[in-house]
Amino acid sequence: ILNRHDRPTAIFAGNDEMAVGVYVAARKAGLRIPEDLSIVGFDDTPISARIWPPLTTVRSPIREVGRAAADLLVKRGAGSSGNQELQSFQLELVVRESTRTI
């Protein structure tokens, strides 16, 4: 996909580790990050700030999500089948140097 004439200008990876794989593939294809390809990851893991250029990523509230999941398991373990619950969590875009405006 990165060697195509109509290649994408940006890739959103499912997590930061996958984004590192995109960095490797982009460099093998001779692409510069972010000049030729913007890359965004997800999870804001430590590697996102250590690679070059530092990865723009999405941070999710891991503890809050874990706490909500544990609360739901406790409710279900106590015999409450209840209705399915829909919860939403605030995500944060951590802008670093792997993206640019086109």
Where on the chain are the PLM-derived regions?
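Flexible loop/turn connectors
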Residues: N3-I102
